[in-house]
């Protein structure tokens, strides 16, 4: 835009937002901060839904006591992330002294790496730098503006909608291309909302790659939700490029976790979500991120469909079309019109040499036939193995979902128990039991991912014994919590629940300590999928 004076990214509760579409380009321009957007018409409830409520920071460890006390982190709001971004821009601008919007574009080009930007900025070739970043050198703006000044006396046609407007209704970037306010607004809204573009929106003129600065976007967009979407896209770039920051993966949560160093550690967001900072998945102890990624991919893609096809069908030995046997006869005829090969289902050899052996193949010792059968058996064994671990993984996942619903039932039971002369403190054992139950379910779920890739050795046998013991105790605890509690059985069930959840807690700790000891001593060997 024509002027960047007075533009800054700071929050200012006193500042008013100017939304007049035909305002002079030298008037005060909007800031990128959320406070200004709220003043522009975003209600408190809308803002809470988009940005998350609350402020300040939460330091680990979080609930449950599982987190490493030495792994410190903060949970930041979108506003606090914006302030971090502002501070980064300010630090760079103290040296290069460019308009804030230009500096933001330069930093985005270098993935918010201040050192790389500084190095390139002072290597003596500024024109090449600004060209690569798709912005006009700020030192040449005044000359460009003079070359592109129009006569204000005549109506001019917009080059997008071809309607005539006074010159005052046109605006543009430093490249000199000007369009009417309405076309600008619709163009920017489409780019932001429909295409999800933020930092890479270019001038709408054909062949022009100059990027639209933040001032222009915030001045020409009137919908406060579009502005917040744009702000989120810009801050998302800042977060994604910073290895110490990670968005909370929970749906509709706009908090960011900031750590002192990146690692595969559990972190708790203010929304209640616990996740692995390294990979962003739900916390998945004892399996490492690498193997969990492979497992998720294996479950999501069509690899197991391929396994089923390999286990239940065979390829025609001539044209390699997949064939499923639908009768008892071993004499197979390929249905491919261009093939029509006849072969034996058992050995996959040509049918003609079989003579009259219609239901009995006597060619088991031929190398090619044996190799085909061996491959078939391996595929079947691999499929059965995958289904074994997948079924147990999914079973614990489903049970975990049911157990989360237990909290409501437990709350009701706690209220009933308080009516039978038990204090609030005395009934807290039920909530503690559900907490432990959910932790055990989660751990057991991921032990099956760990076991799927684990090679058999003496340590794996110990692991499987620990897993079986924890699994059995978890099922017993789950059964206790689902029972109806009467006055007569109150004390008995309380003792059983307390004993069992303490045992589960202890066995879970033993299992995890053993797995981590194996990591430290390099005891585990893996099956490459």
Swiss-Prot record:
<keyword id="KW-0677">Repeat</keyword>
<keyword id="KW-0863">Zinc-finger</keyword>
<dbReference type="GO" id="GO:0097413">
    <property type="term" value="C:Lewy body"/>
</dbReference>
<feature type="binding site">
    <location>
        <position position="354"/>
    </location>
    <ligand>
        <name>Zn(2+) 6</name>
    </ligand>
</feature>
<feature type="zinc finger region" description="RING-type 1">
    <location>
        <begin position="158"/>
        <end position="208"/>
    </location>
</feature>
<feature type="zinc finger region" description="IBR-type">
    <location>
        <begin position="228"/>
        <end position="289"/>
    </location>
</feature>
<feature type="binding site">
    <location>
        <position position="271"/>
    </location>
    <ligand>
        <name>Zn(2+) 3</name>
    </ligand>
</feature>
<feature type="binding site">
    <location>
        <position position="208"/>
    </location>
    <ligand>
        <name>Zn(2+) 2</name>
    </ligand>
</feature>
<dbReference type="GO" id="GO:0031624">
    <property type="term" value="F:ubiquitin conjugating enzyme binding"/>
</dbReference>
<feature type="binding site">
    <location>
        <position position="284"/>
    </location>
    <ligand>
        <name>Zn(2+) 4</name>
    </ligand>
</feature>
<feature type="binding site">
    <location>
        <position position="344"/>
    </location>
    <ligand>
        <name>Zn(2+) 6</name>
    </ligand>
</feature>
<protein>
    <recommendedName>
        <fullName>E3 ubiquitin-protein ligase arih1</fullName>
        <ecNumber>2.3.2.31</ecNumber>
    </recommendedName>
</protein>
<dbReference type="GO" id="GO:0016604">
    <property type="term" value="C:nuclear body"/>
</dbReference>
<feature type="binding site">
    <location>
        <position position="289"/>
    </location>
    <ligand>
        <name>Zn(2+) 4</name>
    </ligand>
</feature>
<feature type="region of interest" description="Disordered">
    <location>
        <begin position="46"/>
        <end position="69"/>
    </location>
</feature>
<feature type="binding site">
    <location>
        <position position="248"/>
    </location>
    <ligand>
        <name>Zn(2+) 3</name>
    </ligand>
</feature>
<feature type="compositionally biased region" description="Gly residues">
    <location>
        <begin position="51"/>
        <end position="64"/>
    </location>
</feature>
<feature type="region of interest" description="Disordered">
    <location>
        <begin position="1"/>
        <end position="29"/>
    </location>
</feature>
<dbReference type="InterPro" id="IPR002867">
    <property type="entry name" value="IBR_dom"/>
</dbReference>
<feature type="binding site">
    <location>
        <position position="316"/>
    </location>
    <ligand>
        <name>Zn(2+) 5</name>
    </ligand>
</feature>
<feature type="binding site">
    <location>
        <position position="253"/>
    </location>
    <ligand>
        <name>Zn(2+) 3</name>
    </ligand>
</feature>
<feature type="binding site">
    <location>
        <position position="203"/>
    </location>
    <ligand>
        <name>Zn(2+) 2</name>
    </ligand>
</feature>
<comment type="pathway">
    <text>Protein modification; protein ubiquitination.</text>
</comment>
<dbReference type="InterPro" id="IPR001841">
    <property type="entry name" value="Znf_RING"/>
</dbReference>
<keyword id="KW-0862">Zinc</keyword>
<feature type="region of interest" description="UBA-like">
    <location>
        <begin position="77"/>
        <end position="125"/>
    </location>
</feature>
<dbReference type="Pfam" id="PF22191">
    <property type="entry name" value="IBR_1"/>
</dbReference>
<dbReference type="InterPro" id="IPR044066">
    <property type="entry name" value="TRIAD_supradom"/>
</dbReference>
<feature type="binding site">
    <location>
        <position position="339"/>
    </location>
    <ligand>
        <name>Zn(2+) 5</name>
    </ligand>
</feature>
<keyword id="KW-0539">Nucleus</keyword>
<feature type="binding site">
    <location>
        <position position="279"/>
    </location>
    <ligand>
        <name>Zn(2+) 4</name>
    </ligand>
</feature>
<feature type="binding site">
    <location>
        <position position="361"/>
    </location>
    <ligand>
        <name>Zn(2+) 6</name>
    </ligand>
</feature>
<feature type="region of interest" description="Ariadne domain">
    <location>
        <begin position="380"/>
        <end position="529"/>
    </location>
</feature>
<feature type="binding site">
    <location>
        <position position="347"/>
    </location>
    <ligand>
        <name>Zn(2+) 6</name>
    </ligand>
</feature>
<dbReference type="GO" id="GO:0005737">
    <property type="term" value="C:cytoplasm"/>
</dbReference>
<dbReference type="GO" id="GO:0000151">
    <property type="term" value="C:ubiquitin ligase complex"/>
</dbReference>
<comment type="subunit">
    <text>Interacts (via the first RING-type zinc finger) with ube2l3. Associates with cullin-RING ubiquitin ligase (CRL) complexes containing neddylated cullin.</text>
</comment>
<dbReference type="GO" id="GO:0016567">
    <property type="term" value="P:protein ubiquitination"/>
</dbReference>
<dbReference type="Pfam" id="PF01485">
    <property type="entry name" value="IBR"/>
</dbReference>
<feature type="binding site">
    <location>
        <position position="319"/>
    </location>
    <ligand>
        <name>Zn(2+) 5</name>
    </ligand>
</feature>
<dbReference type="InterPro" id="IPR013083">
    <property type="entry name" value="Znf_RING/FYVE/PHD"/>
</dbReference>
<dbReference type="Pfam" id="PF21235">
    <property type="entry name" value="UBA_ARI1"/>
</dbReference>
């Amino acid at each position: 835009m024509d002027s960047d004076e007075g533009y800054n990214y700071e929050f200012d509760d006193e500042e008013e937002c100017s939304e007049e579409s035909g305002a002079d380009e030298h008037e005060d321009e909007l800031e990128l901060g959320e406070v200004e957007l709220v003043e522009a018409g975003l209600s408190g409830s809308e803002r809470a839904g988009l940005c998350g409520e609350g402020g300040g920071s939460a330091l680990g460890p979080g609930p449950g006591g599982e987190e490493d006390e030495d792994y410190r982190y903060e949970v930041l709001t979108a506003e606090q992330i914006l302030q971090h971004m502002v501070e980064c821009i300010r630090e760079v601008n103290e040296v290069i002294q460019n308009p804030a919007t230009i500096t933001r574009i330069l930093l985005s080009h270098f993935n918010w790496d201040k050192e790389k930007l500084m190095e390139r900025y002072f290597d003596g070739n500024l024109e090449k730098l600004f060209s690569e970043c798709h912005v006009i050198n700020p030192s040449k703006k005044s000359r460009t503006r003079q070359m592109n000044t129009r006569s204000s006396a005549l109506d001019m046609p917009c080059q997008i909608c071809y309607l005539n407007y006074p010159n005052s209704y046109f605006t543009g970037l430093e490249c000199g291309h000007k369009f009417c306010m309405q076309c600008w607004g619709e163009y920017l809204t489409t780019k932001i909302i429909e295409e999800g573009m933020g930092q890479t929106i270019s001038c709408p003129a054909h062949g022009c790659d100059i990027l639209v600065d933040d001032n222009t976007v915030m001045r020409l967009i009137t919908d406060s939700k579009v502005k917040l979407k744009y702000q989120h896209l810009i801050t998302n770039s800042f977060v994604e490029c910073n290895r110490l920051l990670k968005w909370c993966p929970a749906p509709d949560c706009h908090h960011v976790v900031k750590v002192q160093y990146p690692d595969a550690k559990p972190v708790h967001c203010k929304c209640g979500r616990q996740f692995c900072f390294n990979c962003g998945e739900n916390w998945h102890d004892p399996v490492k991120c690498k193997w969990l990624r492979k497992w998720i991919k294996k479950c999501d893609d069509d690899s197991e469909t391929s396994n089923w096809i390999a286990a239940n069908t065979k390829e025609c030995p001539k044209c390699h079309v997949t064939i499923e046997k639908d009768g008892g006869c071993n004499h197979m005829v390929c249905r491919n019109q261009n093939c029509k090969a006849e072969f034996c289902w058992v050995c996959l050899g040509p049918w003609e040499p079989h003579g009259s052996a219609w239901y009995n193949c006597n060619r088991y010792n031929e190398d090619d036939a044996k190799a085909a059968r061996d491959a078939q058996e391996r595929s079947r064994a691999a499929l059965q193995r995958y289904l074994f671990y997948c079924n147990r993984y999914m079973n614990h996942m489903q049970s975990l979902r049911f157990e989360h619903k237990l909290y409501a039932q437990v709350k009701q039971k706690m209220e009933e128990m308080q009516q039978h002369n038990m204090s609030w403190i005395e009934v807290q054992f039920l909530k503690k039991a559900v907490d432990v139950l959910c932790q055990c379910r989660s751990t057991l779920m991921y032990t099956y991912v760990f076991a799927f890739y684990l090679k058999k050795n003496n340590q794996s046998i110990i692991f499987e014994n620990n897993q079986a013991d924890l699994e059995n105790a978890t099922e017993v605890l789950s059964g206790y919590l689902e029972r109806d509690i009467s006055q007569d059985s109150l004390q008995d069930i309380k003792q059983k629940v307390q004993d069992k959840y303490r045992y589960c807690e202890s066995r879970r700790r033993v299992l995890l300590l053993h797995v981590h000891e194996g990591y430290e001593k390099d005891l585990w060997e893996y099956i490459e999928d």
